[in-house]
C-alpha cells in the first residue's frame, strides 16, 4: 500500500506540466505585447520626446525582464519538479539548466522582481509631475520591501549552505 501511495504522489508531479505549458503561452502573449509596443513606437519615433522614448524603451526592458523570468521559471521548474530536459546537443543546452535548485530559483526570481520594480519606479519618477506624492512614496516603500526580501532570502540561503557545509 505504501509503495502505491508513494508512486501516486511521485507521479502527481506531472500535474505541474499544464502550469508550465500555460507559462509558455503567457510567454507567447508577452512576446506579442513586446512587438505591439515596437509597432506603436515606430510611427511616432521622430516626433517623440527624449523622455517619451526613454519611457517606451523602459516598457520594452520591463517586458524583456518578465520574459526572462518566465523562461527561467519554466525551464528550471520543469527540470526540478517534473523531468530533466533531454537535449542531445550540449551546445544548444543553456549553461544554467540543471544547475539551479529551488533556493537559487527563489533568489533569481527575487532579483528579477527587484529589477522589474526598479524599471517601474524609474518610469514613475520620469512622470513624477503628473503623479501624486503619496503614490510615489508607496511605490518606493514597496520596492524597498522587495529589496529587503531579496536580501533576506539570499542571506537565509547563504546561511543554510554554510550550515550544510559544516555537516
Curated annotation (Swiss-Prot):
User: Which GO CC terms are listed, alphabetically?
Assistant: plasma membrane
Give one Pfam hit by family name.
UPF0114
Asked if the record carries the keyword Transmembrane helix, the reply is yes
| TM spans (from-to) | 15-35, 53-73, 136-156
Q: Which keywords describe this protein according to UniProt? A: Cell membrane, Membrane, Plasmid, Transmembrane, Transmembrane helix
Q: Which residues form a coiled coil?
A: none
InterPro entries of this UniProt entry? Answer: UPF0114, UPF0114_bac
Subcellular location(s) per record = Cell membrane
Membrane topology term: Multi-pass membrane protein
**Family note:** Belongs to the UPF0114 family.
NCBIfam families under this entry?
HI0507
Q: This chain belongs to which protein, by name?
A: UPF0114 protein in repA1-repA2 intergenic region
Amino acid at each position: 500500500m505504501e509503495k502505491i501511495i508513494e508512486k501516486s504522489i511521485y507521479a502527481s508531479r506531472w500535474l505541474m506540466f499544464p502550469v508550465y505549458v500555460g507559462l509558455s503561452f503567457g510567454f507567447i502573449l508577452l512576446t506579442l505585447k513586446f512587438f505591439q509596443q515596437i509597432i506603436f513606437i515606430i510611427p511616432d519615433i521622430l516626433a517623440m520626446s527624449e523622455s517619451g522614448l526613454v519611457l517606451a524603451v523602459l516598457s520594452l526592458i520591463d517586458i524583456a525582464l518578465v520574459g526572462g523570468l518566465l523562461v527561467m521559471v519554466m525551464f528550471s521548474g520543469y527540470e526540478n519538479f517534473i523531468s530533466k530536459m533531454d537535449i542531445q546537443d550540449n551546445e544548444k543546452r543553456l549553461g544554467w539548466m540543471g544547475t539551479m535548485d529551488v533556493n537559487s530559483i527563489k533568489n533569481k526570481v527575487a532579483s528579477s522582481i527587484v529589477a522589474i520594480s526598479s524599471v517601474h519606479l524609474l518610469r514613475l519618477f520620469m512622470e513624477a509631475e503628473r503623479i501624486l506624492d503619496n503614490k510615489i512614496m508607496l511605490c518606493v516603500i514597496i520596492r524597498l520591501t522587495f529589496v529587503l526580501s531579496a536580501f533576506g532570502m539570499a542571506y537565509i540561503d547563504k546561511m543554510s549552505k554554510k550550515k550544510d557545509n559544516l555537516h
